[in-house]
Amino acid sequence: MKKNMNNRMVAKRKELLFCILMVLLPTIQFILFYIVTNVNSFFLAFKRHEYGMFEWDGIGRFVEVFNDLFKETINSNMVKEAMKNSFIVYFVGLVASLVFTLLFAYYIHKNYFGGKVFKVLLFLPNILSMLTLCFLFKFFVNRAVPEVFMDLFRKDIGIPMIDGAPTEYGLLMFAFIFFGLGTQLILYLGAMSGISDSIIEASELDGVSSIQQLWYIVIPMIFPTIKTFLVCGLAGIFTNQFNLMNFYGLGRDNDVTIGYYFYKLTTEGKANYPYIAAFGLMISAVLIPVTLIINKLLEKVEKEFV
């Protein structure tokens, strides 16, 4: 009896040690790369950079950000344009990726014709780095597409399609949406695979069409996954750089987003760090309550919808 108790104690200690080791590395990473980094950013927001040093400045950087957002300053046009573009990229990307990913995931889940081909094509961008993908995409639309038009239609497009052409913004948006489909596709497919076959078979026996099955059965049952994407996506509104860095480096002045604008500021020197930190805190002060409210609303929708 005593021996069995000792064995249980040893087993529990080993299990506890295993759990500690499993969470140790992620915990250290969270402390170093989130807490420490953000604590430093918090204090930077109340400082200014002069003569190679950071000095206490109170709310000076916050006033500067407020003026750039709501008044006419040297940087106000760029900041307002970046804010507008960030919202456009977020909402267009959200709607397009949600609709297309759900439809493609459902198509593949139903094992319709060519489903496996779509699965490979949509997940392929996740295998390569984003920089490589952008380089290949830019080469394709600037070089390959004009040559195809010339061979097939004897029509010279004239200018590169993604470098100053009227098609540039549309192609950037297409690339942004397409490159982001793979991860969502896999997660939606995983959620759909958890739906009981008996439910699907019962709906088919009742004469439910594929569209009705998607709307009334599949979407409600994978709604927690959809909700996760919707809530987490809010955090990326002002960090998304729209792949502009990968396509143009630091030389882009049009269609910039807040994420790209921040990155350009960091490369210009430490003097911009307090401004970026203050801007980030103001964004967080708005996004945190908005995210919590939307999460609560989606939870209510989930209870009624599911």
What does each of the following model-derived ranges do?
Residues V10-V306:
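A structural signal for multi-pass alpha-helical bundles of membrane permease subunits
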Residues M1-R13:
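Short, Lys/Arg-rich, polar N-terminal cytosolic tail immediately upstream
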